[in-house]
Each structure stands twice: as structure tokens, then as C-alpha cells.
């Protein structure tokens, strides 16, 4: 089984300024050495703004074009979410952009009502699992982290659970505990990619991006309140070996979501 090289970019975001954010991420991405997957935070081109009618881009707009260009240039998968419009709906949409310009998408399922997100975006209804180098990867977005049924992995449908976020510093204890819980209960690697900095509403995000293995052991954690890019290699053999040795999924409860 092949190892997977993941590059996590923990960055500040410029409020509602697509050009400034894409310029900053271009520099950061170009500095990454060879990597299979580069991951950006939630709403990386605008920050977490509810000004969705003004900020929403079409699927062939500036952010999507930029993602395709960068993925091709670096010969890597580039992932992150943006405010995108399709069929008269606006989504907080995760994009999995491949070097050949093809992509998959996942629309944030759980919209953060305490920030009024549910009144400015359309919720997604389908989970996404993508494949890369023999790995199966399930991307989710920020508030999705609080809902374990949505990430349930009883049949080992995926190997890496990927969360991108604009998670505030005041709730970082929950962020960290929930990331560990998702890794342990789903017997998978979990990567949490968060932004830093103060947004346009005065909310401070401290980062605390993390990579955790299926046993609940910390592989890497970013520095608080600092921009950082980290490239880490993870092993599918290690994951499968632990799953075989400790098959807790065989005793998991059955239930149906209606």
C-alpha cells in the first residue's frame, strides 16, 4: 500500500478579498515541495462571510480557475472550500481539484446557525468519498465535526477524514477533543485544517490544525496563532494493520438514519 503525503496550510485570511487571498495562497502553495494533497482552510478565498449573495462565484469563476491552475502547476490535488453558486443556490462548497482539471465537490451539510449560515447558504445532502493513491478520503467542513453520525465509518468506507474550518479560538477545546474522537471512533486518520487571524466580525481563530492517527495519537499539531505549512506522510499499511488487530467496527451498533 502506498503512503500518502499531505500538506496542510494554516493561514490567515483577508476578509472578503478574493484577489488578496488567492495571491497569498499562490505563494504558499508554490513553496510546497512534492505532495499528493494540499489542503486549504474553509472559505479560503473570502473567509467565513455571510455576504454570500455578493461573494458567490460561478463554478467557472476566478476561484475555481485558480484552483485548476495551481493543481496542474504543482501536479497535486488541491482541496478547500469556497462560496460558490450553482443552479440558483449558494453553497459553502468543498472542492477536490485534480491536476487534470477534473474535480469532485461536497456541500457543507451542517450550516452554523449561530452564525446565521443557514439563512445564507443551501445545505448539502450527500457525503463525498474520493480516492487518491489507493486511499479513500472523506472531506467535511467545520461545524460538520460536531455530528458523528455524518462521519460514521462502520464499514471502513474511508481511511482519512478531512475537516477544513474557520473554527474560533474560544471553542478550540471542543475542536481538539472532537478531532480525537472522530479518529478513534472511526478508526481512521483525521486531519483538521483551520485558519488563524481575526475575521470581519471580530472572531479570532487560533489555528490548532492537527493530524491524528487511528489510535488517537497526535502525529502533528500546528503552532497556535501562527501561519504554518506542514507536509506529513501517513501510512495505509499502519492503518490497516491496526484495524485488523483491533476490529471494533464488528461490535458497532446498527441503526438507520431516517
Where are these regions (language model features)?
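Active-site-proximal beta-strand elements of phosphoester/diester hydrolases
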Residues: 3-13, 17, 105-107, 135-144, ...
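Short beta-strand scaffold segments in enzyme catalytic cores
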Residues: 80-82, 93-97, 128, 192, ...
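CN hydrolase (nitrilase-like) catalytic-core segments centered on the catalytic cysteine
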Residues: 62-77, 146-229
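Cys-nucleophile CN-hydrolase/nitrilase-fold catalytic domain and related Cys-dependent amidase chemistry
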Residues: 18-19, 23-99, 104-105, 168-182, ...
Amino acid at each position: 500500500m502506498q503512503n500518502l503525503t499531505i500538506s496542510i496550510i494554516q493561514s490567515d485570511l483577508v476578509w472578503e478579498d478574493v484577489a488578496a487571498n488567492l495571491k497569498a495562497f499562490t505563494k504558499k502553495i508554490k513553496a510546497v515541495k512534492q505532495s499528493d494533497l494540499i489542503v486549504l482552510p474553509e472559505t479560503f478565498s473570502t473567509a467565513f462571510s455571510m455576504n454570500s449573495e455578493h461573494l458567490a462565484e460561478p463554478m467557472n469563476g476566478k476561484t475555481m480557475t485558480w484552483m485548476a491552475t495551481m493543481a496542474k502547476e504543482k501536479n497535486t490535488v488541491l482541496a478547500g472550500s469556497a462560496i460558490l453558486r450553482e443552479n440558483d443556490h449558494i453553497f459553502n462548497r468543498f472542492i477536490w481539484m485534480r491536476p487534470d482539471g477534473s474535480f469532485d465537490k461536497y456541500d457543507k451539510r451542517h450550516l452554523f446557525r449561530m452564525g446565521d449560515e443557514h439563512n445564507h447558504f443551501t445545505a448539502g445532502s450527500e457525503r463525498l468519498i474520493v480516492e487518491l493513491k489507493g486511499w479513500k478520503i472523506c472531506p467535511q467542513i467545520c461545524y460538520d465535526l460536531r455530528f458523528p453520525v455524518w462521519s460514521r465509518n462502520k464499514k471502513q468506507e474511508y481511511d482519512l477524514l478531512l475537516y477544513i474550518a474557520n473554527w474560533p479560538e474560544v471553542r478550540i477545546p471542543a475542536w481538539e477533543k472532537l478531532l480525537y474522537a472522530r479518529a478513534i471512533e472511526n478508526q481512521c486518520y483525521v486531519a483538521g485544517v483551520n485558519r488563524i487571524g481575526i475575521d470581519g466580525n471580530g472572531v479570532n481563530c487560533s489555528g490548532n490544525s492537527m493530524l491524528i492517527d487511528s489510535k488517537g495519537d497526535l502525529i502533528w499539531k500546528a503552532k497556535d496563532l501562527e501561519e504554518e505549512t506542514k507536509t506529513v506522510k501517513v501510512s495505509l499499511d499502519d492503518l490497516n494493520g491496526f484495524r485488523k488487530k483491533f476490529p471494533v467496527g464488528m461490535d458497532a451498533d446498527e441503526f438507520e438514519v431516517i
